[in-house]
Amino acid sequence: MRISDTGAAFAAERHICAFPGVLGTGMIITSEKGIPQDAQDSLRRSISGYEAALSRFLPYSLVRAMGDPQGIAEHNGIFEFPEYCRPLFDIYDSLYEATDGRIDPCIGESLIQLGYSVPFDLIGNGPASSGPVGTAPGRPRSISAGATPAGFYTAGWRSIRREGATLYTRTPVSLDFGAAGKGFCVDLLSAQLEALGGGAFTIDAGGDLYFSTARSQYSQDSQHSQDSQHSHEAGDVRDPHRPHKSHTVQAGTRITRVALEDPSDSDTAIGICTIGRSTREPGMRGTALCASAPGRRTWTVRRPDSSLIQAHHILDALTGKPARDVEATWVYAPHTSSGMEYPTAWADGLATALFVCDPQHLYNSTPPEINFEFLRLLSGHPEGRTTAAGHSAENASKDASGRPAAHKARYTAQHSPGFPAEIFIE
């Protein structure tokens, strides 16, 4: 996703703090004021500590120890995670229930069986090669007819005993917190930055975005835009149990626009999302916008019958198979003063859940205080319906009204009424 601010605010977040390679994607923080070096060091330590606890890819992490019989013995089956992990585990409790078990941290072994393990970059993409597995890009990963190794944990998240931030298991279990974990780390870091009392900032962690609320000085010097919500009744999903909240951008609000990347072409956009960043109020958290798409993490898998399938990292935990029919998702969690202490974690987790769960079911099943809007692209399009078309984020073609022109393409867009974007669909 590409980000731009309007008016005087565009130059405001001109300080950049980068953390290359962290969380598997890297992170960039842009801020109104420079982040002091000691604060940068503190953020870096927080990220390192987070990965040491929850990364499935680090050999010394606590999560890795849970998947190793020797680790089970060394910890006597008791794994005390940092106390800040308690809310993350609570979120996974909710996601597990809301999706009827389709989002489950115990999916780790299924990912490993499909080839999403260390080092992932050795799996590669493209056609099969003749070399040994992992020695050349494109070599299909072979999977056996059996599923989980003997003695390995196969039950779901609810079957693991938990007390606060402590997990108990006597059987190896490969956990993966990728569905909401990156967003949760972003929320932890954003809380640290907000505690500094500095200026506005944005965190970009590989497509998981957190926008702090604007400071009062923006209320008079920023340009404003009209609400760019573009209604498409055929694709709307409405929540009958929650009041619909308008996300019209009000005067006096700082505006940030985000290009929504075409999942099959990173140089084009399928829409523009408009984020209103209100002046900060006591207790108010910022806004989150998270995207999920399998395109950058796909590889070829050879089945036991020697047939080849394309695999990716977004799995349905009930089947252990890659989700199908959904090409990309976005979830917007607007700023709020209560109920959404971890907006990026929720947006991240729900963006994943939309690959395996009906959006109306998610609205009905998530806690009522979780306020979110969504957009998802489905594969293909119904007969006779014009669907999303990719446009350059900077040079989208225009129709007579000045809007980006819509064309037939590969997707059908489905979204909630309050998703604050202009989608390039007629």
Residue ranges: model-predicted function:
Residues 1-426:
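Mature catalytic core of soluble alpha/beta enzymes
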